[in-house]
């Protein structure tokens, strides 16, 4: 009993130490640390320990005893940033190779040197704020880091009734499937905005794309994600490109016509720089295509 309790307390202590280092790397260098794909950012002690236990389904025996030294060595590496680092995979590789852990980690992340200053941000506008829009908002906000990468700057909706802003904020806070929002949300009625985890998200009320000048809100070179499904062809979605401040458009539904339907991990390399409008395909397509690709590649 004493042995098991002592082991548990030791792992709790290591997880507590990890929280500080994880936060430091995330805030100062925009590094998202994970364990076999599961992010450790903003996680509790128990959640960190559980993330390690879940590796058993991949026949990997891993604990914070193995990953904490990797994280500690990672924190010592200078001039890196804007990346996801899988502590679990590095820990397994280190167990096989051995040697000086600081040298091993420094060599493993060598390709990330200089990243801290090279990743520019991209303004994002959600055109529509239904279920898909709100889930997208959660994902973008959770990865907003220090303002590099995707920055959710605005949502465009039709004004429904009095108290519209508070209602939309409430729907973002709570989801019947995905649970409560991870963080804090407040409403700025005067400036018609939602503040989520420190991100100022302007709520623009408009009935059509033609009504919006995004540059008036400090939004430039933006990616508009149309999640309304109202327009599904290139001609209809091209309305967004005519708005000042918009550079590209993504549709969150299967497209019509010749527009590319893209599933990341399957055909994302088909996207060309001249493609200003693409479709992210349907939820069914995204769910089944990666599995079909694996089967097709294998058999």
Language model region names:
Residues 1-299:
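N-terminal Rossmann-like NAD(P) cofactor-binding subdomain of oxidoreductases
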């Amino acid at each position: 009993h004493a042995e098991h309790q002592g082991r548990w307390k030791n792992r709790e202590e290591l997880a507590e130490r990890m929280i500080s280092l994880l936060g430091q790397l995330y805030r100062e260098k925009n590094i998202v640390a994970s364990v076999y794909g599961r992010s450790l950012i903003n996680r509790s002690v128990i959640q960190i320990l559980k993330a390690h236990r879940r590796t058993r389904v991949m026949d990997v025996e891993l604990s914070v005893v193995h990953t904490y030294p990797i994280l500690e060595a990672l924190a010592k590496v200078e001039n890196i940033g804007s990346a996801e680092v899988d502590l679990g995979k590095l820990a397994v590789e280190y167990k096989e190779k051995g040697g000086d852990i600081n040298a091993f980690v420094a060599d493993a992340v060598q390709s990330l040197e200089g990243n801290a200053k090279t990743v520019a941000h991209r303004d994002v506008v959600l055109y529509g704020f239904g279920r898909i829009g709100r889930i997208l908002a959660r994902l973008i906000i959770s990865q907003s880091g220090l303002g590099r990468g995707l920055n959710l700057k605005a949502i465009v909706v039709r004004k429904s009734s009095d108290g519209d802003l508070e209602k939309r904020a409430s729907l973002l806070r709570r989801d019947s499937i995905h649970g409560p929002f991870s963080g804090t949300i407040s409403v700025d009625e005067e400036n018609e905005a939602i503040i989520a985890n420190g991100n100022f998200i302007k709520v623009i009320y408009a009935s059509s794309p033609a009504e919006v000048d995004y540059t008036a809100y400090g939004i430039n070179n933006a990616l508009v994600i149309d999640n309304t499904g109202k327009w599904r062809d290139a001609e209809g979605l091209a309305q967004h490109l005519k708005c000042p401040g918009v550079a590209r458009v993504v549709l969150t539904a299967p497209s019509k016509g010749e527009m590319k339907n893209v599933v990341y991990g399957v055909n994302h390399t088909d996207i060309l720089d001249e493609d200003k409008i693409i479709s992210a395909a349907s939820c069914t397509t995204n769910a089944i295509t990666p599995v079909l690709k694996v089967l097709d590649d294998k058999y």
